[in-house]
A protein has these predicted regions:
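Conserved phosphate-binding elements of NTP-dependent enzyme cores
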Residues: 1-945
């Protein structure tokens, strides 16, 4: 640190007096044009320095260059609590969050690769007729003249202009217009007819109408007449004519636009928007470019066909009640020879179809209906569809939504595009086939396709292919080769989203930029880590400063500079305990250095648990890239599911097993991916999925409210003498209810001040000074602390404060046990990271009583965790297993994998080359597998112990 400080400050980003969150008035120096890693315990202040100080100041300075109107539209950006920052260049933050919640957003649209593919197909794509499969052809009028003279020489022909193609209508007005223009004949549905006054067709039938422009014998001597006829026919037929050979009875189409000469099918002139599923010109007309449609699922309407209608077999209706709809259904059943008490499985196909889809037949008079009125019945399906109307309440729409299932669009089969767009080809591939290729295969296709193009096509495609090739190179380099351009951005993990943005930034070739990344190694297998580090160095070598908030050992050792924040978390952190090169770091005495140089380590358990002898078996999993996989999990053990990125870990656990169990135990609506059978489900009584989603959507949500310890704390305050004298109830101590909360800020602790043309400013409430409660409520104190003081305590402080209160201590202590001692009891959920939110949820489950038969599912719980935090987490997970539960973890971190009792390793690669279980067993057994990539890295880890 001193070395940089002594040099010219223009060589670094110099931060002086940073006090954001828990930072202790620190100075930090980040060298320009270097790869710097900021590390430290969870909650030590890494993100406070990188994102909340450096990035926030960079954004603030950028926004200040805008007009006051623009600043108001963008919202307020507070100045971070720092004395000064010098040497700051433009800042770009690449965080771990899903790129886009829009179902139309894909990897292709985010990275712009799909945009270049659209341009490529619009310029050199070869059109093929979707009717005949023949290449589409377009001509000039001169070429059409030459073709007709050559093909129909000395033959009698009709020159026709197609006007109506397979459409309903009487066309009375059309015939009258043609008659007034002087035309005598038309061909209607293949028959030649004279145009007469009042001529009309059957309006309910589909018709084909062609105008007879001329009837002549083709001859080179009369080419001028033919040329003029072609010009008139082209004008009347909107650029299309048909030449009908009278003797042979055959017609041939000619067009100035792309046309099928056999069927007359015409395509628009191709443009990039014709290949976009976000454009009306390119999108599938059925699904509007989404690739899927919501259809009513009969299995959701009738989940159990062994039940009767009377006993509630039709879920939307429930059990029998004496109402009109049940009397109508009773009428259908009686008509078909059944009753409401007949099991649904015994009803005829016709009866069930009428119950679901309705009938126009008159029903037996239901009770209460006069004999003069015999109502018809619309059906259950129609009733549910009516509830999806915008005019009904959102509650009714939500109710109806449970009976729908997203289904692949029956028209485009998930391709999102219309038929025309899907019938342009380059080297035998349409744009959807390319979008569905894995990025590694697409890169190979792009690298070789140029050689297969014609000379003119090569000239046109050269620059477009260069842009595509560049972007695919970077996407493959950051370990995303198993994904495809068609992959929805909504389905990406935080780590995948971050690496996509990283690849996009590298491809943009910007220089003199400060990039700040938040744990880019998340979700990445050890094998792919080298490629990620190489990409970051590539970004640095372009002339950029790269700052990475990271815990990965390889990333630290490969960096140019390391800043270690500590020594502990929360109030005991916030200091720069080390700054220097990785080599200097290894010799320092910090906690991080101890884990890097091997003096500290996470110990491997002396003995592996074998489980309780019971198993959970999942057979025939075939979702996404899974190859008919059978999964067997020993219960009562710590199980790790491992494998390279894209090998199928999340597919088999999060998208197959977890939804199956959630449906069984909680009637979840989420459908699992395809599987054949599950056995052993009776050996567990609960499934708990601990993910990284926020613990609440409102800033009012916090660890105290989520764990429900706040209810215990409020009950404690109610029992205090002062509260009893005043007659206070628990609601008095809630900041969500009127009475005890501050009436000025409504319990928020701050007020929003409108600044007209400037952004609104958030200021602490002048009445409660940010404490959320009114003066009377704050007068009730326990051990000298008010309810607001308690919420402002860290978990570590609260554990000491409530040490003699078992009901409160038990819930707070588990938060401390999972490494969250540094966060505040009342800390808004919006300020918690994904890893912190996950551990709050884990602590909440730990505080509950269990039967010892619970299955816990955790997806990368080490996200955001330092080596020391992982050691603490492993202690918590082992406690769960020791109580008889099963813990199932999807993880890449070798410190967790080496401590597992049982490993399921998937692979061998990602994407189409994955989807298999490569090896199962203890870590030692995985090390012996020749096919396991995880085993190769695990072997090194276990050998170093």
């Amino acid at each position: 640190m001193d070395k940089i400080k002594k040099n010219d400050e223009t060589d670094c980003v110099a931060v002086y007096g940073a006090r954001v969150h828990n930072l202790k008035n620190i100075d930090a120096f980040i060298p320009h044009d270097k790869l710097t890693v900021i590390t430290g315990l969870s909650g030590s202040g890494k993100s406070s320095l990188a994102f909340d100080t450096v990035y926030a100041e960079g954004q603030r300075r950028y926004i200040e260059t805008f007009s006051s109107y623009a600043r108001n539209m963008l919202g307020a950006l507070e100045r971070p609590d720092v004395d000064k920052i010098t040497g700051l260049c433009p800042v770009i933050s690449i965080e771990q969050k899903t790129v886009n919640k829009n179902p139309r957003s894909t990897i292709g649209t985010i990275t712009e690769v799909y945009d270049f593919l659209r341009l490529l197909f619009a310029r050199i794509g070869e059109a093929v007729s979707y009717k005949s499969g023949k290449p589409m052809i377009k001509y000039t009028e001169e070429q059409i003249l030459e073709l007709i003279l050559g093909k129909f020489d000395n033959q009698k022909v009709l020159i026709l202009s197609p006007l109506v193609n397979n459409r309903k209508g009487h066309y009375k007005e059309l015939f009258e217009q043609l008659r007034r223009k002087g035309y005598l004949n038309v061909r209607v549905d293949g028959e030649l007819q004279e145009i007469v006054v009042g001529m009309r067709l059957d309006r309910y039938k589909n018709h084909n109408i062609e105008l007879v422009v001329d009837k002549l014998k083709v001859s080179g001597k009369d080419s001028q007449r033919l040329k003029e006829t072609i010009a008139v026919a082209m004008k009347q037929g909107d650029g299309v004519i048909q030449v009908f050979d009278v003797e042979k009875g055959e017609g041939f189409f000619y067009s100035k636009s792309l046309m099928d000469p056999i069927t007359g099918l015409s395509y628009r002139e191709p443009a990039p928007h014709n290949f976009s599923f976000n454009s009306m010109q390119g999108a599938c007309p059925k699904c509007k470019g989404l690739g899927s449609v919501n259809l009513i699922d009969v299995d959701k309407i009738i989940p159990d066909k062994s039940k009767t209608i009377y006993s509630g077999g039709i879920l939307p209706l429930g059990s029998y009640s004496n109402n009109f709809i049940f009397s109508q259904i009773a009428g259908i059943c009686e008509k078909e020879g059944y009753s409401l008490k007949t099991p649904i499985k015994d009803l005829s196909e016709k009866a069930l179809d009428e119950i679901l889809n309705g009938t126009d037949e008159a029903l037996v008079n239901p009770a209460g209906i006069g004999r003069g009125y015999q109502p018809t019945y619309d059906g259950i399906v129609k009733y549910i569809e009516m509830q999806q109307n915008d005019e009904v309440s959102s509650k009714a729409q939500k109710w109806a939504g449970q009976f729908y299932t997203p289904t692949v669009c029956p028209v485009c089969h998930g391709a999102r595009l219309n038929r025309e767009a899907l019938h342009y080809f380059i080297d035998g591939k349409n744009i959807d086939e390319l979008a569905n290729m894995e990025l590694s295969d697409l890169k190979e296709w792009v690298d070789t396709v140029e050689q297969k193009l014609g000379k003119q096509q090569q000239v046109v495609a050269k620059e477009i292919l260069k842009e595509i090739r560049s972007r695919l190179h970077f996407l493959n380099d950051v370990g995303l080769d198993y994904l495809s351009l068609s992959r929805s951005s909504m389905s990406l993990s935080g780590g995948e989203s971050q690496r996509i943005r990283l690849a996009t930034q590298i491809g943009s070739q910007l220089v003199n930029v400060l990039y700040i990344l938040d744990e880019p190694s998340i979700g990445l297998h050890q094998r792919d880590n080298d490629r990620l580090i190489h990409s970051l160095k590539e970004l640095r070598d372009l002339g950029n400063t790269v700052v990475v908030v990271e815990h990965d050992k390889d990333m630290m050792l490969e960096s140019d500079y390391v800043i270690d924040i500590g020594p502990k978390a929360g109030r005991k952190g916030g200091k720069v305990v080390f700054a220097g090169t990785p080599e200097e770091m290894l010799k320092s005495g910090t906690l991080t250095a101890g884990y890097l140089n091997g003096s500290l380590k996470i110990e491997v358990p002396a003995k592996r648990r074998k489980g309780n002898g019971k198993k959970l078996t999942l057979r025939g999993c075939s979702g996404n890239n899974l190859k008919d996989v059978d999964l067997t999990l020993p219960l009562g053990a710590l199980i790790c599911v491992t494998g390279v990125s894209g090998s199928g870990k999340s597919t088999i656990i999060n998208e197959t097993l977890q939804p199956i169990l959630s449906q069984k135990f909680y009637r979840s609506l989420k459908e699992p991916l395809p599987y054949k059978a599950i056995k052993g489900i009776e050996n567990i009584d609960k499934v708990v999925s601990v993910d990284q989603a926020p613990i609440g959507k409102s800033p009012r949500s916090n660890p105290a409210t989520y764990t429900n310890v706040f209810a215990n704390i409020r009950n404690l305050f109610v029992e205090l003498p002062e509260a009893k004298i005043r007659g206070y109830k628990p609601g008095r101590f809630s900041f969500n209810m009127s009475g005890g909360r501050c009436d000025v800020c409504k319990g928020n602790g701050y007020r929003s001040i409108e600044m007209n043309f400037l952004p609104n400013v958030l200021v602490p409430c002048e009445a409660c000074h940010g404490q959320r409660y009114n003066r009377e409520t704050l007068e009730v104190r326990f051990k000298g602390k008010s309810i607001a003081d308690v919420l402002d305590m860290t978990i570590n402080q609260a554990v000491e404060f409530f040490e003699n209160m078992p009901s409160i201590l038990s819930k707070i202590k588990v938060l401390q046990d999972v490494g969250l001692g540094y966060i505040k009891l009342g800390q808004p959920s919006s300020t918690l990271s994904g890893g912190e939110s996950q551990r709050v949820k884990l602590a909440t489950e730990l505080s509950k009583k269990d039967t010892g038969k619970t299955l816990f599912i955790l997806d990368e719980p080490t996200t955001g965790l330092h080596f020391e935090d992982i050691r603490i987490l492993m202690g918590v997970l082992n406690k769960l297993v020791d109580r008889g539960n099963t813990v199932l973890v999807i993880e890449h971190n070798l410190d967790v994998i080496k401590c597992a009792d049982y490993i399921v390793d998937m692979g061998p690669e990602g994407g189409k080359n994955g989807g298999k279980i490569i090896a199962v067993g203890t870590p030692e057994e995985i090390c012996e597998s020749k096919d396991s990539i995880t085993g190769k890295f695990l072997r090194k880890e276990l050998m170093n112990l």
